[in-house]
Amino acid sequence: MPNITVTSLLAMKQKGEKITMLTCYDATFAHTASQAGVEVLLIGDSLGMVLQGHDSTLPVTTAETAYHVACVKRGNQGAMILADLPFMANATLEQTFINSATLMQAGAHMIKVEGAAWLGESIRLLAERGIPVCAHMGLTPQAVNVLGGYKVQGRLEAQARQMRADAIALEQAGAAMILLECVPSELAEEITQAVKIPVIGIGAGSATDGQVLVLHDMLGLSISGRVPKFVKNFMTGQPDIQSAIRAYVAAVKDVSFPATEHGFSA
């Protein structure tokens, strides 16, 4: 697979080719996933839950994320490396820049930040200094205590209207990509059509420009036993992990995943 860049992802959206993304935290899985055709490897703060055993993503630090970014970089075979900016790592503009630079120096190609229109100044700062940014909207796990739990966002018309406006504002601020988590499928489709940059979904229906899942979820691995509605176990019927990942890539590309049952209504 040729090296995936911001330009590559934009071209895929323009051609209508679906983008595949998986979380990844080490060199072996980075090699396996990128060889299987995954375009974007996300070093998510989900590592706090699936690797460290926490009940939320909040305890994860920038240093821990940078460590896993460096691990992924060593095994990667051409995929884009997207790194989460952890909880409170962007509390000020100075912190945003310093922590983002740390992750880029560790090997990331793009930084993901959680929030809404208030991220505009931070995104503009980073984009102007050569750091591509993915804006994570909808259900933002770092704000779980404010949101009252892991709930679908944007079901109320006022919320949906605000989310559409925020997406456009963040694109104008310089965001290179948007990730929508747990929003009604119809709203996700509207946002995808409203912006020129790629929109990746998780629990956001099939009309987005691509999909992302937590690696452990799509392999059927879970400590709690609770499986989110938007997850499919791609390990079922497959002889090995790389085959399962290839099945995920194929299903996203031919739009057989996500199916209607993996999404949410307004």
Swiss-Prot record:
Annotated S-S bridges: none
Keywords: Cytoplasm, Magnesium, Metal-binding, Pantothenate biosynthesis, Transferase
Enzyme class: transferase
This protein's GO CC annotations: cytoplasm
Pathway: Cofactor biosynthesis; (R)-pantothenate biosynthesis; (R)-pantoate from 3-methyl-2-oxobutanoate: step 1/2
Transmembrane segments: none
Active-site residue list: 181
Cytoplasm among keywords: yes
Record: residues binding Mg(2+): 45, 84, 114
Cofactor: record remark: Binds 1 Mg(2+) ion per subunit.
Cofactor dependence: Mg(2+)
Assigned EC number: 2.1.2.11
Binding residues annotated for 3-methyl-2-oxobutanoate, in chain numbering: 45-46, 84, 112
Compartments reported by the entry: Cytoplasm
Subunit structure: Homodecamer; pentamer of dimers.
Biological role stated in the UniProt entry: Catalyzes the reversible reaction in which hydroxymethyl group from 5,10-methylenetetrahydrofolate is transferred onto alpha-ketoisovalerate to form ketopantoate.
The protein, known as: 3-methyl-2-oxobutanoate hydroxymethyltransferase
Organism of provenance: Pseudomonas savastanoi pv. phaseolicola (strain 1448A / Race 6) (Pseudomonas syringae pv. phaseolicola (strain 1448A / Race 6))
Lineage: Bacteria, Pseudomonadati, Pseudomonadota, Gammaproteobacteria, Pseudomonadales
Protein encoded by which gene: panB
